[in-house]
C-alpha cells in the first residue's frame, strides 16, 4: 500500500492545483490544463511501455504525434475535387510505383542468394523507382498546389467523422513503429536513440514540406471536431434554458430586465466554453482509461512478462 501512497499524493496535489485554478482564475483555463494533462498522459503511457518496461530508448515520439495530426486531415477533411482532377492520378500512380518497388525489393531479398546480383538488383530498383517517382509526382504536385493555394492546395481527406481519425492515427503510428522496429531494434541503445530521433525528424519534415498532402505548415480551414461549437451552443434554446436555471439565484437578484439579459448572455458565453471543454475532457479521459486497461492487460500477458 505504501508504494501507492506517493502516487495518490501526487495526483491529489495536481487535482487540488487544477481546482484552485478554476476557483481563482477560470474553469475554462482549469479544464484546458486538465485536457493537456490527459493528452500528455496518452503519450506518457506509450513512452513508459517502451522505455520504462522494455528499456527501448525512443526519442521519436514527436514523429508519431505528427502522424496523429496528419490522420485528422486525411480522414476528416472533405476531398478537394479540383485538386484530385488536377493531379490526383499522378499521386495514385506514384503510390503503385512504390508498391511495385517494395515487391521487387522483397523478391530480390528472398530469391537472390548471391550478394552481388542482389545488391545490383535492389540498387537498380531503388534508383529507377526514384526517377519514375520524380517524373510522375512533380507535375502532379505542382498542379495540386496551384488549386486555390490560399484555402486548399492539397488533396483533402475522406470526409469521415473526426473520431475515426483517432483510429487512423493509431494505425499510422503503429505502421511507422513496425517499420522503425524492423530497421532499428537491433541497434545499441545510443544508436537506437539517434535512429528514432532521425526517423521522427524525417516524418515531421515530410509533413511540413509536402503541402499537397496536408498543406504543410499552413492552416487547414474547417476541421471537424467531436464537440459542438461554442457559437452554436450560445444560440441553442435548450442550452440557454439550462444556464438560466443553473444561475437562477444570481439572475433573480437583478431587477433590471436589460441587465438581467446582459448577465444571462455573459453566463451563456462562459458556460459554452466550459461545456465544450468538458466534452473533450470526457473523450480524452475515455481514451486514457481504455489505454490503461489495455496496457495493463498487455503488461501481464506472456509478451509483457518477457519485457
Go through each PLM region and give its residues.
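Transmembrane alpha-helices and adjacent helix-loop boundaries
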Residues: 1-306
